[in-house]
Amino acid sequence: MPGYETRFLLDASAPRPEASTPTAASSAGADALDAYSRTVIDAVRAAAPAVVHLRVLGKGPDGTVGPRGSGSGVIFTPDGFVLTNSHVVNGATSITATLSDGRSVVAWPVGEDPDTDLAVLRLHDSVPGWAPLGSSAALQVGQLVVAIGNPLGFEATVTA
C-alpha cells in the first residue's frame, strides 16, 4: 500500500528511541517514595513488638467450646493492656495471645464496647514491647497512616 511500511519489532533497521535520562521530577518522585518506604519500615520496626495474635475459644450453638476465630491486637501499656476489636473477643470463653517473641499467654477481658467495636484485654505476663496510643485529634483527613496486624497468625502484616 502506498504510504505504509511494515516493520517487525526486532527490525534492526528501525530507528531506536533514545534512552531517556532520569528527569529531576522522576528522581524527586523516586526519592519521595523511598523516604516514604523508610518511614513505613521504621514505624513497623518500632511497633511490631507490640502486635499480638489472638486465638479465641467460645461456645458454639450446641454449647460445646471450640475455636471461634482469631484476630490482632496491640499492647498499648508496659503492663500488658491490649487493644483489639470487640467482634474478635465477644462471647469468648478463653483468649490466648501469641506475642512477637513467640510466647503464648492468657489474655483476660477487661471491657468491650460493641458500638465502637473496641475491646481491652490484659496480659498478666511480661511483654516484649508496647506502642503508646496517639491522639486522633492530631490527625488530619487524608493524612497517611500505617496499620500493622497479625491476621491468621501472619506476623507483621502492614497496610500503608
Residue ranges, per PLM feature:
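Short loop/turn microsegments at loop-to-beta-strand junctions
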Residues: 70-72
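Conserved active-site neighborhood of the chymotrypsin/trypsin-like protease fold
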Residues: 57-66, 77-157
